[in-house]
């Protein structure tokens, strides 16, 4: 037994017997040590020892199981050293290798092999790895749908599903929906019953006045929205009453607060009175005019809060109360047959997939659990009354205790298995569960924290508890006191039952463990570094100033680079700037919510500042040139009649043809595919023919090898015979390139270790990885074990601890892809579908969809809150938080508003509408004494109140992007280098040396003009350049990228409520989707716009902004009539055009060989018998006589568009027009 000093709760958790025991262990509380000590004491108790093989210890991972077995063995060996020859200890050591210290899946697999005969399963089954399972699942899914389509005639529900949810061009959306529904159902112990119940969600016979899940969910959704509206209106009222505020608004706002609160009071009653009240409710049409001299910022704040409340209530009214409740319910009833058919498809696919696996003697991880349930459940068991089988009863008697680690991460199937093998419900309970629900972060793996929470709330905490007891381990032995106080300060205010699913009360908060290291000086304050954006970039990337939407993501990438630079500066400060290292790099970890797409940027910035760093980059492998080249060759070996892979191989170093030689190959056979042209060119002799003939000979050998031999051997033979492996080794980064090729070889070997064979299937598997966004990441240049800064995701850091944690990218928006499907899935509610009428081309969310979406959103928010908790509790010595906040002043105003409540926790609307970690943490700091730098930016700064319990200390730093750019402009070691140079003796004068130095310093790079010009340019940028040239403006070098002017502030918005950029985007949507064969009168266009709004192509605000009269005038004119009668029309037509670089970049006339690719989208192109007509939509405001100036401004752009059209379609563009939306006219470009 351990000699360490256990706390009282730890001792109770170790020694409590004959109860179901839930140990709620906070971060750093030593839960693993408690679990190991409990096992050791049970097996080494002299009075009542338990054989170690009669304990079932379930861990989350194989590594955790191995570590626990190792710890138990070491403890027994230590005891044996103290008591040599003690029979009990020797006996337990002999039993330990057979002990059930295992993962849940390993336990299930062992049970299946032992009792396979009960379910007619081959005991020699093999567990499929993820690669094998993914291929087989996809193949089975495709074959399953092919079989369904053979009998689709006479199955109207299946036809409806294909039409409504199948996608525009194929049925992949429906296939993925069925596959996802099957996988989701398998997380339930009774998947068939769950599918039947899920399909019936929304079909509540009590309607919206009952207490069914749909009615309850709608009331909760409406009530939450009204609560948020009341909060916004009260904030507006407070701003109106503030000194200098628009006091004249106060009476109207007070009445609106009261009226909204009355609406909220009706939510618990019947639906029809609530609906009537909603329809009758209205805001004051126009607030009184504010007196002169009123504080403009307070007035704007008041208007902004009131506007948000109005929009919120209007959205609720339009979504739920514009139609009668019978209409809402009738939509669900109409979808009932289709949802039941969808559930049946998922069940039938599951059976087809199970059959395919059994044919190969395979099982997946879900099979392990469900087959195990078949063995453990007696025949006749139901979800309401599960009965243990004789096998389960025997295991209950055999296991003296069942101990479960990381209990917060199990799912419902695993819970049922544990319930069946333990005596959880018996007279002598024996289930021990340990975990921390605040660290349950595996929802994406269908973990179910509600199972932990159910027991957390139900179990008693006293020593005299009956058969179930809860013990809280709150002492943290990991972090310094300053970090513990900071974690408590944040989560006391943000983790609530309404949003975080748990109250962060005295039972949940952390207590300093009191070790000397923790208490020494209590540690430095927690640092917070906030980074604002340049004025042209806001919280949402601003569009261009023009009427065309900006499709560039440059601003987002720049934000990542800026924050990476900020973090690099922090690391350099920690490590010591003068060469004396105060914190080793290996002690520093940078944590992010997700590293995909960002870790590479951080690595590059760290490398630039000479900071060694390591990250498992999950992207970039398949884009590596060497990997693309070999994969192209494998595609050609599989099927040489693929033009693009074949051309890529011929152009690559594997063959080495140039562009002119490829053109010559194409000319050898102009009619056939490219492979036929290669064969023809190979027979024409000459050097080119000889090269191609040699390639074809090798290709035929490889194709023969692919049919008969090993795939891995084929790949290595390609490396060896072509010398390509050695070739890439000689390129820059050669070691990494060779590592990438070895990884491809290893992947092929792993693939061949499965039940699959063949090159085609391997390539299909690679395609599945790429389509699913799964990448291997390039081979890293540094190892994780070296003295490097580690960059990892928060999930990768779970269970680990680090001396210094930098939690970066806290401004990242929460990513919630589960909320965007046409059919949403929820474990308790079931299916939430869109209502779709394919014939009428109508599609919109049902009430059930809204309810399911809101529940999923709340659960995902709770998950994000737990992820933040995990991140902040990884630090031992120092915790540093960084984030980009867009326009910092606006963000601080938002946080100031959020922090305005006086309660111990932040208001529920604030917590529920957070979009990032910053939206939770910063309002807490706004009310803290150390948050003064934030409050100075706010309109109204409340005194820092804090809370009586709050002993946290913070250090807040606000950074301007300009500071980072200036710091990045110089080498970090420049100052030291210059100082060293100053100390050197002067060099003796030498005329020849002077001349050489002069020549060297006077040299100019001959291609500097090219270096500042991009190889690809957007049509929007070309348009800007042409417009600048037309206006006689001086061109800005391309090295300084164009930045859009800042978005208009809210108080300058037009009456329509849209900025010019947003209006331009909305008009483009309308002109793209208008039915030109339909009614283009004023009423007809209004009807079509209403249809676009209903299908959610437009928001209500955008739809109201569309001027149907001007559009009708356009289409009634000559050009509009020609457009309606055209031979064909193409809208939003993308193009790429290669042009001489000097046509775009003045000053490059001396480089006629250089080319630039122009990429753009043509608004409209239509054909008439004698040629093509090109039309570009413009929403610019035009003054009297301004049409000609506008034509001059855009002439260069439309010339370029016309060249692109003529190059691609080989037809003449006879006319070019500007469609001037604001004047309702068309302007021809001469």
Swiss-Prot record:
Cellular component, GO annotation: cytosol; DNA helicase complex
Gene3D superfamilies the UniProt entry points to: 3.90.320.10, P-loop containing nucleotide triphosphate hydrolases, PCRA, domain 4
Residue stretches making up the UvrD-like helicase C-terminal domain: 517-799
SUPFAM superfamilies to which the protein is assigned, alphabetical: P-loop containing nucleoside triphosphate hydrolases (SSF52540), Restriction endonuclease-like (SSF52980)
Reactions that this protein is recorded to catalyse: Couples ATP hydrolysis with the unwinding of duplex DNA by translocating in the 3'-5' direction; ATP + H2O = ADP + phosphate + H(+)
Domain of life where this protein originates: Bacteria
Cofactor: Mg(2+)
Region called Disordered, residue ranges: 535-554
UniProt keyword annotation of Nuclease present: yes
Database matches in PROSITE patterns: UVRD_HELICASE_ATP_BIND, UVRD_HELICASE_CTER
GO molecular function: 3'-5' DNA helicase activity; 3'-5' exonuclease activity; ATP binding; ATP hydrolysis activity; double-stranded DNA binding
Xref: InterPro entries: AddA, DNA_helicase_UvrD-like_C, DNA_helicase_UvrD/REP, P-loop_NTPase, PDDEXK-like_dom_sf, PDDEXK_AddAB-type, Restrct_endonuc-II-like, UvrD-like_ATP-bd
Pfam families in UniProt: PDDEXK_1, UvrD-helicase, UvrD_C
Chain residues that bind ATP: 25-32
Keywords annotated in UniProt: ATP-binding, DNA damage, DNA repair, DNA-binding, Exonuclease, Helicase, Hydrolase, Isomerase, Nuclease, Nucleotide-binding
Ranges of Acidic residues composition bias in the record: 545-554
EC code(s) of this entry: 3.1.-.-, 5.6.2.4
Domain UvrD-like helicase ATP-binding: 4-480
GO biological process, one term: double-strand break repair via homologous recombination
Oligomer status and interactors: Heterodimer of AddA and AddB/RexB.
Biological role: The heterodimer acts as both an ATP-dependent DNA helicase and an ATP-dependent, dual-direction single-stranded exonuclease. Recognizes the chi site generating a DNA molecule suitable for the initiation of homologous recombination. The AddA nuclease domain is required for chi fragment generation; this subunit has the helicase and 3' -> 5' nuclease activities.
Family: Belongs to the helicase family. AddA subfamily.
Protein name: ATP-dependent helicase/nuclease subunit A
Organism: Desulforudis audaxviator (strain MP104C)
């Amino acid at each position: 037994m351990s000699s360490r000093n256990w706390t009282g709760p730890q001792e109770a958790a170790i020694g409590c017997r004959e109860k179901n025991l839930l140990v709620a262990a906070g971060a750093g509380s030593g839960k693993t040590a408690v679990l190991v000590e409990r096992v050791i004491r049970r097996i080494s108790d002299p009075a009542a020892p338990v054989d170690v093989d009669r304990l079932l210890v379930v861990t989350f991972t194989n590594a955790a199981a191995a570590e626990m077995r190792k710890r138990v063995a070491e403890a027994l060996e230590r005891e044996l050293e103290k008591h040599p020859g003690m029979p009990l200890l020797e006996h337990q050591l002999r039993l330990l290798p057979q002990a059930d210290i295992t993962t849940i899946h390993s336990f299930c697999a062992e049970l299946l092999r032992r009792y396979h005969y009960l379910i007619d399963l081959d005991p020699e089954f093999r567990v499929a790895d993820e690669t094998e399972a993914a291929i087989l699942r996809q193949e089975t899914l495709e074959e399953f749908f092919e079989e369904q389509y053979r009998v689709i005639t006479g199955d109207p529900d299946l036809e409806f599903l294909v039409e409504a949810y199948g996608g525009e061009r194929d049925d992949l959306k429906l296939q993925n929906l069925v596959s996802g529904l099957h996988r989701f159902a398998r997380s339930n112990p009774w998947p068939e019953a769950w599918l039947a119940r899920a399909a019936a969600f929304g079909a509540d016979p009590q309607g919206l006045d009952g207490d069914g899940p749909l009615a309850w969910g709608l009331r909760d959704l409406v009530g939450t929205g009204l609560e948020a509206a009341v909060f916004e209106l009260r904030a507006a009222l407070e701003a109106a009453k503030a000194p200098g505020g628009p006091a004249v608004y106060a009476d109207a706002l007070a009445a609106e607060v009261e009226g909204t609160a009355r609406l909220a009071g009706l939510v618990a009653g019947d639906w029809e009175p609530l609906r009537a009240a909603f329809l009758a409710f209205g805001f004051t049409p126009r607030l009184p005019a504010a007196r002169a001299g009123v504080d403009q910022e307070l007035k704007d704040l008041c208007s902004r809060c009131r506007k948000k409340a109005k929009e919120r209530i209007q959205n609720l009214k339009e979504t739920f109360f514009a139609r009668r409740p019978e209409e809402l319910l009738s939509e669900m009833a109409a979808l009932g047959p289709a949802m039941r058919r969808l559930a049946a498809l998922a069940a039938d696919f599951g059976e087809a997939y199970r059959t395919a696996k059994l044919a190969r003697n395979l099982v997946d991880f879900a099979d392990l659990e469900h087959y195990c349930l078949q063995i453990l459940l007696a025949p006749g068991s139901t979800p309401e009354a599960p009965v243990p089988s004789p096998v389960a009863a025997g295991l209950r008697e055999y296991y003296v205790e069942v101990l479960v680690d990381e209990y917060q991460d199990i799912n419902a199937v695993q819970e049922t298995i544990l319930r069946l093998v333990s005596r959880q419900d018996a007279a002598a309970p024996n289930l021990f569960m340990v975990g921390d629900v605040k660290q349950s972060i595996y929802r994406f793996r269908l973990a179910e924290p509600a199972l932990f929470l159910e027991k957390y709330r139900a179990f008693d905490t006293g020593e005299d508890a009956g058969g179930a007891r809860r013990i809280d381990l709150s002492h943290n032995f990991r972090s310094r006191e300053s970090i513990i106080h900071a974690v408590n300060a944040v989560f006391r205010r943000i983790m609530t039952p309404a949003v975080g699913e748990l109250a962060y009360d005295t039972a949940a908060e952390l207590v300093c463990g009191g070790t000397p290291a923790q208490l020494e000086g209590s540690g430095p304050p927690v640092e917070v570094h906030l980074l604002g954006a340049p004025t042209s970039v806001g919280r949402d990337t601003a569009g261009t100033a023009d009427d065309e939407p900006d499709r560039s993501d440059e601003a987002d990438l720049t934000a990542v680079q800026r924050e990476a630079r900020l973090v690099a500066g922090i690391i350099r400060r920690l490590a010591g700037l003068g060469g004396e290292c105060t914190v080793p790099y290996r002690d520093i970890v940078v944590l992010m919510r997700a590293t995909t797409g960002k870790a590479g940027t951080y690595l590059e910035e760290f490398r630039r500042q000479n900071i060694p760093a390591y990250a498992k980059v999950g992207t970039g492998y398949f884009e590596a040139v060497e990997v693309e080249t070999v994969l192209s060759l494998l595609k050609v070996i599989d099927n040489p009649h693929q033009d693009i892979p074949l051309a890529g191989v011929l152009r690559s170093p594997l063959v080495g043809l140039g562009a002119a030689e490829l053109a010559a190959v194409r000319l050898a056979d102009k009619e056939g595919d490219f492979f036929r042209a290669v064969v023809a060119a190979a027979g024409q002799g000459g050097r080119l023919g000889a090269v191609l003939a040699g390639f074809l000979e090798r290709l035929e050998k490889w194709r023969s090898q692919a049919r008969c031999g090993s795939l891995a051997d084929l790949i290595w033979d390609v490396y060896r015979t072509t010398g390509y492996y050695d070739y890439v080794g000689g390129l820059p980064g050669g070691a990494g390139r060779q590592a990438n090729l070895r990884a491809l070889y290893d992947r092929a070997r792993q693939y061949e270790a499965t039940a699959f064979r063949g090159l085609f299937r391997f390539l299909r598997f690679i395609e599945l990885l790429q389509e699913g966004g799964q990448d291997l990441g390039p081979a890293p240049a540094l190892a994780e074990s070296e003295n490097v800064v580690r960059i990892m995701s928060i999930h990768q850091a779970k269970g680990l601890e680090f001396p210094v944690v930098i939690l970066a990218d806290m401004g990242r928006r929460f990513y919630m892809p589960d909320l965007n499907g046409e059919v949403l899935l929820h474990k308790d509610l079931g299916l939430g579908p869109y209502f779709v009428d394919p014939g009428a081309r109508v599609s919109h969310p049902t009430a059930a969809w809204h309810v399911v979406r809101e529940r999923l959103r709340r659960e995902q928010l709770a998950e994000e809150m737990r992820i933040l908790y995990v991140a902040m509790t990884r630090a031992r010595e120092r915790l540093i938080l960084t984030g980009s906040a867009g326009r910092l002043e606006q963000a601080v105003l938002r946080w100031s508003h959020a922090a305005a409540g006086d309660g111990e926790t932040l208001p529920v609307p604030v917590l529920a509408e957070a979009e990032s970690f910053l939206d939770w943490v910063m309002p807490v700091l706004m009310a803290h004494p150390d948050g003064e730098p934030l409050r100075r930016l706010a309109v109204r700064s409340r005194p820092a109140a804090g809370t009586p319990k709050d002993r946290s200390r913070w250090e807040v730093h606000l950074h301007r992007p300009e500071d980072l750019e200036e710091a990045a402009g110089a080498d970090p070691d420049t100052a030291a280098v210059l100082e060293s140079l100053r100390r050197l003796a002067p060099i003796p004068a030498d005329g020849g040396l002077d001349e050489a130095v002069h020549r060297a310093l006077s040299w100019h790079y001959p291609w500097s003009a090219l270096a500042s010009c991009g190889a690809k340019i957007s049509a929007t940028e070309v348009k800007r350049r042409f417009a600048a040239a037309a206006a006689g403006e001086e061109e800005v070098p391309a090295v300084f990228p164009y930045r859009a002017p800042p978005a208009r502030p809210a108080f300058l918005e037009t009456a329509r409520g849209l900025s010019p950029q947003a209006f331009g985007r909305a008009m483009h949507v309308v002109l793209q989707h208008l039915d030109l064969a339909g009614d283009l009168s004023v009423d007809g266009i209004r009807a079509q716009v209403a249809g676009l709004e209903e299908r959610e192509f437009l928001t209500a605000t955008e739809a109201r902004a569309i001027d149907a009269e001007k559009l009708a005038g356009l289409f009634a004119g000559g050009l509009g009539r020609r457009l309606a009668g055209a031979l064909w029309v193409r809208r939003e037509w993308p193009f790429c055009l290669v042009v001489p670089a000097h046509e775009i970049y003045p000053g490059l006339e001396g480089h006629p060989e250089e080319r630039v690719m122009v990429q753009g989208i043509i608004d409209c192109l239509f054909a008439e018998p004698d040629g093509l007509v090109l039309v570009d939509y413009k929403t610019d405001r035009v003054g009297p006589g301004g049409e000609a100036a506008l034509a001059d401004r855009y002439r260069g752009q439309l010339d370029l568009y016309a060249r692109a059209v003529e190059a691609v379609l080989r037809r003449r563009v006879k006319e070019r027009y500007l469609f001037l939306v604001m004047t309702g006219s068309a302007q021809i470009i001469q």
